[in-house]
Amino acid sequence: MSAMALSSTMALSLPQSSMSLSHCRHNRITILIPSSSLRRRGGSSIRCSTISTSNSAAAANYQNKNIGTNGVDGGGGGGGVLDCVIVGGGISGLCIAQALSTKYSNLSTNFIVTEAKDRVGGNITTMEADGYLWEEGPNSFQPSDAVLTMAVDSGLKEELVLGDPNSPRFVLWNGKLRPVPSKLTDLPFFDLMSFPGKIRAGLGALGLRPSPPAHEESVEQFVRRNLGDEVFERLIEPFCSGVYAGDPSKLSMKAAFGRVWVLEQKGGSIIGGTLKTIQERKDNPKPPRDPRLPKPKGQTVGSFRKGLSMLPTAISERLGNKVKVSWTLSGIAKSSNGEYNLTYETPDGLVSVRTKSVVMTVPSYVASSLLRPLSDVAAESLSKFHYPPVAAVSLSYPKEAIRSECLIDGELKGFGQLHSRSQGVETLGTIYSSSLFPGRAPPGRTLILNYIGGDTNPGILDKTKDELAEAVDRDLRRILINPNAKAPRVLGVRVWPQAIPQFLIGHFDLLDAAKAALTDGGHKGLFLGGNYVSGVALGRCIEGAYESAAEVVDFLSQYSDK
């Protein structure tokens, strides 16, 4: 198996939607949301922990002070009903709405998106100050067709920026940053693994390894069995730290890296499954690619000229008054006629909304609390997903602070670096932001985004932001930065107490149990979405959004007026 397949991105993807709960106000108002757009008024902008100028203040400007009250309906009948309410205005919720508005535009689905915060985008947090542009949540995405379609449909085609696919990626091993092979011809020559380790990996990928066990394997068990100890310790373990901030001895191979896991199931070995997949694609070619989409040149990652926040901002602007911010869901009930009644705390008091279907894209622990009145079994399953803390630490150094041995043609080049937990550093990984995308730092400066914490280091919650910045700086001076360099400029330290859902062994069992409990309890039309369902990468959230939209459309097809 190529290391390229498991090391294709250095981006660490954080949860894409979140929702805070707060106490309800007084003054109950029951309304019918009309399908026509209403005017919206401005809100307030998000601020950063250290330097607090946001490039996306527009994303915060969605307060709904004046709610239309045409068709006020105080009971269960006689008034109109929404087709769908999407709970959570992070990237998953917004992209479900966008999919309903574009891919299924012919159906004229009447929906709203509700978000408890005063801005959309969830944990996507782009900041800008003094010539710097940095991310404090997700950093980038892989430019899959689903992501590119969402960007183009949002009017952002000309704002896309893609990293150089030839830029190297590095892993720290034995005190040295070592490049990860980016193409098959690199495999014999890279020094991250020994010659015997490469032979072991090749033989295992061909099928000369122990047979798979009957039980669900962890990532560590699967990789050690199939590809050997070196691939696990020097490639996959740091990759798990960088993508999931997780412990590979607990992560489920099937759930966390299903596309690799299924190869062995399909073809008897990783290579066998790969060959079978290639043949299946030849026998069943995809439909013609959308000619509107740009074509990336090789494996790379992408963003937008002014950061990831451009996407949720653009989607929200296009959806207009269908997006309701500062709407905190306080209760959900099922009526006798099959509709759902949702109660919200809003700036205008309590609002009740009636709908045929609901998609919950909030984190599982929030969904658990909200759904407990409907199903204890579903709520209990959803409460068991684990979210460890992660901090995003953005530092800037003068270019001359970079160690000479880490420069390529006199510049810091590459996507970034990942760190195995065995190498004695706290930092999980480092993104070379100013090398990856243009316009991220002033001339003569570098911008470096670092992640620290995760499932193996929850103690970051006991540290101050200054202590976290010092810990990252200390690690970098052992690897990338000259020990005697001046102190960095700390642009931002953002701590996410519950960051990335862990796809642990038994993940699908919990998810299936929650879904089954809702269905068996008579709660059809109530769907679960978000990153704990689709996958943690931003691209998987968008792909999952299209899947959720298809579920909603299929459910609504039972109504004669659809």
From Swiss-Prot:
Its cofactor is FAD. GO terms for molecular function: oxygen-dependent protoporphyrinogen oxidase activity. SUPFAM superfamilies: FAD-linked reductases, C-terminal domain, FAD/NAD(P)-binding domain. Keywords: Chloroplast, FAD, Flavoprotein, Heme biosynthesis, Membrane, Oxidoreductase, Plastid, Plastid inner membrane, Porphyrin biosynthesis, Thylakoid, Transit peptide. It holds the Pfam family Amino_oxidase. It is a peripheral membrane protein. InterPro entries: Amino_oxidase, FAD/NAD-bd_sf, Protoporphyrinogen_oxidase, Zeta_carotene_desat/Oxidored. GO terms for cellular component: chloroplast inner membrane; chloroplast thylakoid membrane; plastid thylakoid membrane. Residues 278-293 have a biased composition (Basic and acidic residues). One of its GO terms (biological process) is protoporphyrinogen IX biosynthetic process. FAD binds at residues 88-93, 115-116, 137-140, 323, 536-538. Binds 1 FAD per subunit. The keyword Metal-binding does not apply. Pathway: Porphyrin-containing compound metabolism; protoporphyrin-IX biosynthesis; protoporphyrin-IX from protoporphyrinogen-IX: step 1/1; Porphyrin-containing compound metabolism; chlorophyll biosynthesis. It catalyses: protoporphyrinogen IX + 3 O2 = protoporphyrin IX + 3 H2O2. It is found in: Plastid, Chloroplast thylakoid membrane; Plastid, Chloroplast inner membrane. It comes from the Eukaryota. Residues 1-48 form a transit peptide. Its EC number is 1.3.3.4. Residues 274-302 are annotated as: Disordered. It is an enzyme of class 1 (oxidoreductase). Catalyzes the 6-electron oxidation of protoporphyrinogen-IX to form protoporphyrin-IX. Belongs to the protoporphyrinogen/coproporphyrinogen oxidase family. Protoporphyrinogen oxidase subfamily. This is Protoporphyrinogen oxidase 1, chloroplastic. It comes from Spinacia oleracea (Spinach). The gene is POX1.
